[in-house]
Regions:
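Flexible "arm" and connector segments at domain edges
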Residues: 1-68, 72-112
Length: 112
């Protein structure tokens, strides 16, 4: 699956959640609430990673793949809601980091 499809499916799913929010609470969550939900799920990923590495046990270790997927979902939704292209965000970050590491002090410019 490419990032464009991730964005399309994520935003379609988010629209369905907005319908549920309007039904249950009379309004949709704002960008800030979506960002907080992402941070909550990212924290859960951290906690489940501790279990995965044997650092702190959890009875919910089987949730790790879904929580990682949910974090990607939130990021795609947040990018879309803030008028950013998710694929461009990811590509730009990776290109920037690759360039920074290529030119890091002590590097000869060649892969080790």
């Amino acid at each position: 699956m490419d990032l464009e499809e991730v964005t399309e499916r994520s935003c379609a799913l988010r629209r369905r959640y907005h319908e549920l929010e309007r039904e249950l609470h009379g309004s949709e969550w704002g960008v800030e609430e979506d960002a907080l939900a992402f941070l909550t799920d990212a924290g859960i990923v951290g906690r489940l990673a501790m279990d995965h590495e044997g650092r702190w046990p959890s009875a919910e270790a089987d949730r790790l793949p879904a929580k990682i997927g949910e974090c990607v979902w939130w990021l795609a939704v947040l990018a879309e809601r803030m008028d950013l292209d998710f694929e461009d965000c990811v590509d730009g970050f990776l290109a920037e980091r690759e360039e920074a590491l290529l030119n890091a002090p002590g590097r000869s410019g060649q892969d080790a």
